[in-house]
Amino acid sequence: MEEFEKPKPIPAYYCCYLLRSTVRHASLYIGSTPNPIRRLPQHNGVAKGGAKRTARDKLRPWEMTLVVEGFTSRVGALQFEWAWQHPERSRHLDSDDDLDSKPQAKANANADAKTGKPKSKPRARTRRSLMAHLEDLHSLLRSTYFSSWPLRVRFFCADVYRVWRAWNDRVDSRLPDMIKVILDGDNLATAPDTNQRDGHAPVGNINNLSIDYTRLEDHLEKSMFMLDDPDDLQCTVCKESISPNEEQIVVCPHPNCRGTSHLLCLSTKFLDATNETDLLVPTQGTCPSCGNTVQWVTMMRELSLRNRAEKEARAILRKKEKRVRKESAAMEGSSVPRSSSTEPRSLLEEPTQDDLGPNWFEEVDIESDSDVEGRQKHRSTQPPSKLEIVIEDSDWDDAELIE
């Protein structure tokens, strides 16, 4: 019998990014990764890996001017990356709106006056400018396929955001409400003060991005605690009892809410509350229990981790418990001297076999085709990873480098 690979949880983080050479600003590179904190040093030659087209010393160092984050799968990020790299070949940029915003593309779509047949497209030139890439990004985010995805554009360079803003003010079509723009990095001096949560707040620089499941700890802990004893729980929509072992159950992420629902019940309720009849998956909705707005992707990320990686989910909670105890002990120790014999037991215990390392979610990432030999040596001396959560960064052979 054919064995099927067990489905993996939704990745904690995946993004597409636009690199720019700090030496020559006209040199640009588009890529994708589950870990931009690690990826940027690779492009700059500080760590092994990176891409062949960013390996020239005369163009280093590179900077990440912006990231498009919020992808719920590696496949989705790769689709977006390819379309951004090859706008002239992407079916997502063939809509009438996109043709209106690109006069040359609109002219190419006209029929030949003599034969009546559509004119053949001339061989596309490489799109070289920063403005061109931002135009394509804007069009992709407005496209039918990507406009309902929970994506965020995070700008780290103020001059790049100014170019984006100039184009955004010129184009007639606006970004969907689902797409968020976050001012970060150099933009913080002029960015409005914000206390946004769920990854919408500025972080200052690439190294401060939250790329693991830490932000899901409280939600995951509450869900697993409640669903371990579901006898008194019922669906907030249909009011029937729930059975976590047999049904897909979602839990409201808000801290003080105990709302639990059948997956299909809540998705139907959220979809019925919208005016978009073509929408198959909800983007957000109002929790029937607490009345707060809930992002659908937040619940799906927690549900997939709880159902598809229960062992690892419990290890995450053990790590949180140990961290909290250690922090509490440190706070007590700062005011009252403590001997080693009075340390909490959890601090003296050796980690269990099930405990996860700090980078467990990325242990199987493949960085680049330029580091195949190094990876093979590394794998020969390291035990296999316990869970393949995300896979490799993208490094297309024909990835676009603009010079």
UniProtKB/Swiss-Prot annotation:
Its main location: nucleus. The keyword Chloroplast does not apply. Its cofactor is a divalent metal cation. Its EC number is 3.1.-.-. GO terms for biological process: double-strand break repair via homologous recombination. Gene3D superfamilies: GIY-YIG endonuclease, Zinc/RING finger domain, C3HC4 (zinc finger). CDD domains: GIY-YIG_SLX1. It holds the Pfam family SLX1_C. Residues 12-94 form the GIY-YIG domain. GO terms for cellular component: Slx1-Slx4 complex. Residues 91-126, 321-403 are annotated as: Disordered. It is found in: Nucleus. It comes from the Eukaryota. A zinc finger (SLX1-type) spans 235-290. Residues 362-371, 390-403 have a biased composition (Acidic residues). The keyword Cell division does not apply. Keywords: DNA damage, DNA recombination, DNA repair, Endonuclease, Hydrolase, Metal-binding, Nuclease, Nucleus, Zinc, Zinc-finger. Residues 116-126 have a biased composition (Basic residues). GO terms for molecular function: 5'-flap endonuclease activity; crossover junction DNA endonuclease activity; zinc ion binding. Catalytic subunit of the slx1-slx4 structure-specific endonuclease that resolves DNA secondary structures generated during DNA repair and recombination. Has endonuclease activity towards branched DNA substrates, introducing single-strand cuts in duplex DNA close to junctions with ss-DNA. Belongs to the SLX1 family. Forms a heterodimer with slx4. This is Structure-specific endonuclease subunit slx1. It comes from Penicillium rubens (strain ATCC 28089 / DSM 1075 / NRRL 1951 / Wisconsin 54-1255) (Penicillium chrysogenum).
